[in-house]
Amino acid sequence: MRPMTRKTRIQPIEHAVEDDDNGYDRPSKSQLKREMHALQELGQALVDLPKDALKRMPMPEDLADAVREARRITDHEGKRRQLQYVGRVMRSLTDDETAALRTALDAQRGVNKAATARLHWIERTREQLLASDDALTEFLRQHPDADIQEGRTLIRNARKEAQQGKPPRYFRELFQWIKAAGGASDSDDEAAGDAGDDHDDEA
């Protein structure tokens, strides 16, 4: 009796998928698109910064030039093209440079958040002082070092100029009085809507 021979099925050789020449996964198209979009947003955030804050951003000179140019352009289409260019320059940054920019922007946003909250408090307090004499009593109780006579004079004059439709001189001065009494920093805007254009650039 002839011995039975077992047929061995030859399995196909599975070739290892080569990620790339360097042995790591190449980013997918969707990942690259997300990264490009994130850099574009970062560039837009730089363009939107107040000029004093922009000076503190750790930017290479070519990026700084591109951002300043984008801030100067007022034409919608021209600005859109320049923002795209800012995004291209952003993509040339190293990871460390990008990380440094993000860190600086996050710090600036924290400062802005605190300053905005303080600004809103001053505005609310001013409205309360103009609306009720009792508000001044409460304010002075909380801020005993404030100049009482000056505060009363400013409130009286601000009410009068509002009734007469005059320019809001004392209205603005009352803002400054509240800011000084409340210990707010000098970086606060003088009044909502009364600040200068933050996007004016140096000559």
From Swiss-Prot:
For this record, an example GO cellular component is: cytosol
Question: Is RNA-binding one of the keywords UniProt gives this record?
Answer: yes
Q: Which UniProt keywords apply?
A: Cytoplasm, Ribosome biogenesis, RNA-binding, rRNA-binding
- Ranges for region Disordered: 1-31, 183-203
Q: Where is the composition biased (Acidic residues)?
A: 186-203
Question: InterPro entries from the xrefs?
Answer: DarP, DarP_sf
Positions of disulphide bridges: none
Q: GO biological process: what's one of them?
A: assembly of large subunit precursor of preribosome
Instruction: List where in the cell it is found.
Output: Cytoplasm
The molecular function terms in GO held by this entry are: ribosome binding; rRNA binding
Q: Does the keyword rRNA-binding apply?
A: yes
Q: Which family does it belong to?
A: Belongs to the DarP family.
Query: NCBIfam families annotated for this entry?
Result: PRK05255.1-1 (NF003593)
Q: What does this protein do?
A: Member of a network of 50S ribosomal subunit biogenesis factors which assembles along the 30S-50S interface, preventing incorrect 23S rRNA structures from forming. Promotes peptidyl transferase center (PTC) maturation.
Kindly provide the name given to this protein in its UniProt entry.
Dual-action ribosomal maturation protein DarP
Lineage, top ranks: Bacteria, Pseudomonadati, Pseudomonadota, Betaproteobacteria, Burkholderiales
